């Protein structure tokens, strides 16, 4: 899948905290969120120039430039200057934050979901809540978890740009060779564990499943659906304290530990990079991954299937790592209005189908199902595309975007890694991660 980044970008967030703080107090001229147009009235016919940092590589940038030109043609009073904004998507947060200080930030930019809270609390974003709540926008067609990511302290700072989710991908040949029935949409985690054990063949060096123990966010976010399905929480309601070390969190990690240590059915990847190629090659029977794998699955001609995640107590809840188009405030009612209008056009059913689906991503809206672009996309990336689209309904809550999540994720990843390699108990490791995360979360 040709997405700009999966599963989660966290590195850049550590380096820009001071810039964001400086931007909040620099007096650079941008007004607080939602202030544009408080007294003045937006004139949709006024000449306006807006800047859009897409955060995309060359192929995607060209596609988006074409859409901007199309909008310009239909709205000749609006000039949209489009560029990637930075050399890589990871660098965008640093660039935007520096722009807050110098007054050179854009009107619209791509942002990883992990940056949402930091940007939303900078004092430089628009609040477009009133706009997205208009009936014609059909805001609820976008998955709830993605909408929540774009909402900071009750303010809607933008519109989701990309949605995804984690599902179960299985290699049909490995199942056929072992004489094991394929996974079904109503599988429990006990079904998953039993199948993984049957599929593991030490003589042939085939594992039933895999898990990253690199300690990265790839390690961490795979635990969260199991925690949620058990009824647990990642953070306290105010986002200031860890809650993952609850009885539910311990039970979720103990389940994975049983597969890794007791069953020895789990390949432990030290790098994040090995388990997918091993799955393609038939050395791993099942992996937990997302629609970004569809391109490689097609390219490698893998015979595979996709189901929702297995469930605890019938709950197939999964997780998403949505990214966001963030709209910025320049204390200019016409710039704010034009930016909002363009953003709603860009993320409409008709236009998103020509962007995300054309680029191989999941559609942003449920209403895109059945469009010609959707039909082509589903056929091009069969059999996995439709199940991953359907799995969006199992995204019930957002992954945290609080500033301290980046640091917390590192400690949780280290805890999971230790437990799955037999170096600690789930309780001790998660308690230690919670303690280590306290300062980062209490900001």
Where would I find each of the regions flagged by the language model?
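Extracytoplasmic/periplasmic substrate-recognition and gating elements
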Residues: 46, 73, 178, 258-263, ...
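Extracytoplasmic "Venus flytrap"/periplasmic binding protein-like
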Residues: 70-142, 177-179, 278, 285-286, ...
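C-terminal capping/gating helix-and-loop segments adjacent to ligand/active sites or protein-protein/ligand interfaces
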Residues: 383-433
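Hinge/lid segment of periplasmic solute-binding proteins
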Residues: 113-165, 219-222, 303-305, 375-380, ...
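Short, solvent-exposed loop/beta-turn-alpha elements that line the ligand-binding surface or hinge
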Residues: 40-43, 129-142, 185, 207-216, ...
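Periplasmic solute-binding protein
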Residues: 116-123, 146-183, 212-238, 320-328, ...
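Glycine-centered hinge/linker elements that transmit conformational signals in sensory
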Residues: 195-198, 238-268
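Short, low-complexity disordered leader/linker segments with a strong preference
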Residues: 1-50, 73, 428-431, 435-443
